[in-house]
């Protein structure tokens, strides 16, 4: 059992390292594309300010920017390669990682990052990171 636990912890560590490398490689390309249009920066600022509200969505961003949702979608697809909704979800997940690392419960994390349903949050987190948020949280608890 101890061997299984040690091997699974090592596998998770390798997976997290690979995810970090992937993110580091992808980030400069995304950063370069979003610098081209100040509207992207405005939208990202709105996301950073409102991601924690569950009712916050692409429609909210479009309304605050006084553009149609279609225009906002085209802008994001062209400059970032993601829809505004995808970017918002990614942003929420990244913020949730930080809260889990600080020891916040899965339910508190989900609600703090704009997910109304902690079970939905867990499914999305697991699909994105390959492990449930509870395991991710425990992994950082063991390190500290």
Q: Residue ranges of each PLM-predicted region?
A:
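Base-recognition residues in the alpha-helical recognition helix of bacterial helix-turn-helix
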Residues: 71-74, 120-123
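Short, Lys/Arg-enriched anionic-surface-contact patches
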Residues: 31-39, 82-88
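Terminal helix-turn-helix DNA-binding modules in bacterial transcription factors
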Residues: 59, 78-119, 138-144
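Short coil turns linking two alpha-helices in DNA-binding domains
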Residues: 64, 68-69, 116-117
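…primarily DNA-binding HTH/wHTH and HhH modules…
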Residues: 123-144
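Basic, amphipathic alpha-helical hairpins
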Residues: 1-8, 19-30, 44-57, 76-80, ...
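Pre-recognition alpha-helix immediately N-terminal to the DNA-recognition helix
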Residues: 38-46, 88, 92-95
